[in-house]
Amino acid sequence: QPVAREQALALLDRVGLLAHAHKYPGQLSGGQQQRVAIARALALKPDIMLFDEPTSALDPELVGEVLKVIQSLAREGMTMLIVTHEMDFALSISDRVVLMENGVVQADIAPQVICSPLEAPSLQRIREFMGVR
């Protein structure tokens, strides 16, 4: 049990919540609860993490704290599959971007290709959808 507690505290520290280790879920904000969920998933030492709209239910002021944790995981080399509408964020941390429409893959490309209008003119519709000019 001391090892599990030590690991739990280390993971809470990793997601910026060590100071809240004594709190119950109802005492945490939505963003804090989401970060606890990330810490719990990390406890299993996964090879890949799936995030399905990790910020969709959060108040706008809490979105940044969750994205910061995910960005940190990306920098550490964690493989992640992220379903998101946070387009700028996805482009900034991704090695690959897969865009789907009506369940069909429209593109599976490097974010640099999306951000460069001179490359692949056929992606113009996708760029417009993502707000990339």
Residue ranges and their predicted role:
Residues V104-R127:
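Conserved beta-strand-loop-alpha-helix hinge in the C-terminal portion
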Residues K23-G26, L44:
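Conserved signature/switch motifs of ABC ATPase nucleotide-binding domains
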Residues T84-H85:
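H-loop/switch region of ABC-family ATPase nucleotide-binding domains
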Residues G64-E76:
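Helical segment within the ABC ATPase nucleotide-binding domain
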Residues A90-S92:
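A short, surface-exposed alpha-helical micro-motif characterized by mixed small hydrophobic
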Residues P60-L62:
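Helix N-cap at the start of a conserved alpha-helix in ABC-type nucleotide-binding domains
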Residues M49-D52:
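Catalytic Walker B motif of ABC-type/P-loop ATPase nucleotide-binding domains
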